[in-house]
Amino acid sequence: MPTTNIRNYIDLLGMFNIGLENGLLEKQEIVKWADTIILQDEQPDYFVIELSLCGHKSVNDIVTLLNEIIGASTPQISGRVILGLLYHRYVDRQLPLKKVVDLLYWLILYGQCSEEEKSFMYELDDRYSLAIDNIYGTVEAVEKATLRFIELYKEFRIDNFDKWSEVNRTIDQKITNLKTVVEEENKALIQGSGKTILKKAWWKFWAK
């Protein structure tokens, strides 16, 4: 029987960490994963045993435990998997749009996202606030834009960990393609309205 090297699962643990911290995952999902590893291993890693027994612990205690292995920075791919999880749970009507947007903003701050990803997320957060306050745009339009963005990550699932690296290699190009589409849409909108769209300073590529 194999013996799991917990260091090979840093990306997965990072995803668990983000999901727990933001209420997207339940601690029993982590316990279930650890139990599965224990059953398949001849000599389970002590850390996996700790996770298996953490069902009675608080979320904060489990997050602290995970951080002992993950370290100071959560891997970028962990945040991208969370985006995939957001997509599936939103389309399955398990999450409200506000929860999705709130988690996007959290990922801007702590998710090790690329600058292009942050630009999309900043825009969605700002558009949502403006729509909710009845200042500009509609919630329906924000929902459509949000879904179009997080759909890029839909091939990430908790149960296809062995495919994460392969899926991750496709993400940057998908983001580039979406960026091009949005730029073309903005140009058409400007030409159609004859007006200049005000852009936030942090939306770096929108003005290019």
Pin down the residues of each PLM region.
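Acidic, Ser/Pro/Thr-rich low-complexity regulatory regions
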Residues: M1-K208
